[in-house]
Amino acid sequence: MMKKRYFAIPILAIALHFLLSNLLYFLVERLVLDVFHIPPQQFMKHSYWGEILIYAVLILAFFTLYKLLWRKDISEPRTATNFKDVLGSLVVGFGICGISGLWIMLAEQLPSLQKSVEAMNAGTENIAGGNAFGTFMIAVIAAPIVEEILFRGIVLRSMWKFAPAWASILISSVLFGVYHLNIVQAAYATLMGIAAGILYEKKRNLLFPILVHFANNLITMLQGFAPSEVNELISIFILIMIAPAGYVICRSLRQGKRADSM
């Protein structure tokens, strides 16, 4: 009976995120347009403030749910926040972004995926109406927090209750990828989910997967706003980070094996 409950949690949590986020978007839009009578053009220009508010509510809601679900696990061993693991998490995020860049370059050459790449690029450009501050607050800060609480803190942890760690990481990462609703984005989001899931499984500290996500989205944002000369340097940097990212992940896996054998 307990396993059935944990089996339902990932599905219900993802559905709740989908429904709540869409409901909040609808309510904010109606409040601004119908109650405050702000002109649509002005609303669109500053709509990122509404999105930031929505993400703040989502973070509060899902962090509360996360705490309620796992309040009995509060005493479990976890890695305290430290400079070495913070830096390692950022390196993993940068390296995943490097792999993502290679994947996108390949996808651009495949006729069957070109429309998906175009849709993904258009969606990225439309975040916060193209406003740099809004994009940073939404895509770089807020989205990593709420999505990691949801997919690592709730979905992955629930799956640990009825499936092996490797299967839980893989399935939760695929769900994370599919949730992006774009085949090109889903592929590298799944890869990022696996890396973030490994760090969370070994460290039991949500900050580390959040930092992986943060680093990945930060690079994506910088590439969208930086001039071409700077973009070339960013591309070289994230490609160089692939090897160190692999090292950090392998080290985490080895540390986990040593801990299990003790």
Where are these regions (language model features)?
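Functionally important transmembrane alpha-helices
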Residues: F18, N22-R30, S173, V178, ...
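Membrane-interface helix/loop boundary segments of multi-pass membrane proteins
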Residues: V146-I171, I198-N205
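Juxtamembrane helix-loop-helix connectors linking adjacent transmembrane helices
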Residues: H37-H46, D73-A143
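Hydrophobic alpha-helical transmembrane segments
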Residues: F7-A15, I52, V86-V91, F133-M137, ...
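Alpha-helical transmembrane segments in multi-pass membrane proteins
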Residues: A15-L69
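Membrane-interface capping segments at transmembrane-helix boundaries
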Residues: K67-I74, V248-M262
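Interfacial transmembrane-helix boundary/kink motif in multi-pass membrane proteins
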Residues: M1-L19, K45-W49, W70-L102, K161, ...
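Hydrophobic core of alpha-helical transmembrane segments in multi-pass integral membrane proteins
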Residues: I14-N22, Y55-L65, G93-W103, S235-R254
